[in-house]
Amino acid sequence: MRKNKYGTYGTFSRSFSRVLAAAFVAAVAAGTMPVYSAYAASPSFARTEEEWAKLRDNVIEYDELEGLIHEYNATVQNNQYTYQKFRQDYGDTNEEVAQEYYKLAQDYYNDMSGDDDASSRMSDLNLQIQGDNMQKQGDETLEDSRIYLLTYEQAEKNLVVTAQSDMISYYENLIQKEQAEATLTEAKENLALAQTKLSAGTITQLDLLTAQENVQTAENNLTQLENTIKNLKENFQVLLGWSYNDSPEIGSLTDVDENEIAAMNPDTDLAQAIENNYTLKINERKLENAKNETVKNQLTTAIANNKKQIGASLSGAYKKVLSAQISLQQAQTKAQLEQTNLSNAALKMAAGN
């Protein structure tokens, strides 16, 4: 996946990566070097050799998704660059950001000519409006580098959740594909039987057409599932840094941890959920930066609503986990019962009963 033709890997700082990327594009355009695959976002010392080896192999494991998103997802890498660019252009604090807006406003004001002809007056009016807008943004801005960082961290966490959901959906669709294949096999067997019965005169032509339609429907369902699996796999691996036409191996899903479920408690977990919530963190930071009393009141209300929503979401998620756990236990019990019935039937058959 990320190995170059010499069998080595590279990780660079973001600033150096951009210099490298510029040289890389120029070299490729000139035809002087082959195209290489994506580099990791973090420098080599950010992880152990063992951790890098797991991320760089051609196997996607469920517990690697967070690391793969952080290192190789294009959106995350772009956000990291944008964050550093924001700090470079505007600074870290809200006051520094406001001052940059004021500087832009002053630049517009300085460009006004003050001439009295119609063209100059129109130009000066436009510059005045743009300068006033910059001045207003400086007065009202709630931004600082911390808010940008939290926003991008939130986006990264959401991408991890998307990757986890995609991997689960991939295996769900594989199971559905197996069921669709079994349905198609049964439909074909029924069609063959129907053809035999039609020849014997025990069914009508309409019955045969129905059997043929069942085969066609089963084939269509299977084709649709195969396309869904193909598209899902391509999008999934691109999300993690592979090309759409690569062929990484997708590892198995992790087993359910019953102890982890047993340790869940919405009441005691609420404080941690509030602490981890990015929307709440961002609004609290905006409140710290707010200067206008109306804005402060709006953010205070939003924060209170955030906390209520976090509690409701946590409780709902906990109930879904318990419901899924019950469904899993029922499915396991049913599978065990079917296995017992199969074993008993085999014993009876062996005994001639």
Describe the residue ranges of each PLM region.
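Surface positions of alpha-helical coiled-coils, especially the charged/polar e/g heptad sites
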Residues: 61, 68, 75, 123, ...
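Charged, solvent-exposed structural "stalk/scaffold" segments
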Residues: 79, 86, 137, 175-224, ...
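Soluble, cytosolic/nucleoplasmic coiled-coil alpha-helices used as oligomeric scaffolds and tethers
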Residues: 82, 89, 96, 100-103, ...
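Amphipathic alpha-helical coiled-coil segments
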Residues: 76-79, 81-93, 141, 148, 155, 162-177, 287-290, ...
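Short flexible linkers and secondary-structure junctions
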Residues: 3, 8, 41-165
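Sec-dependent N-terminal signal peptides of Gram-positive bacterial secreted proteins and lipoproteins
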Residues: 2-4, 10-38
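Short, solvent-exposed, mixed-charge loop/turn linkers that connect secondary-structure elements
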Residues: 226-268
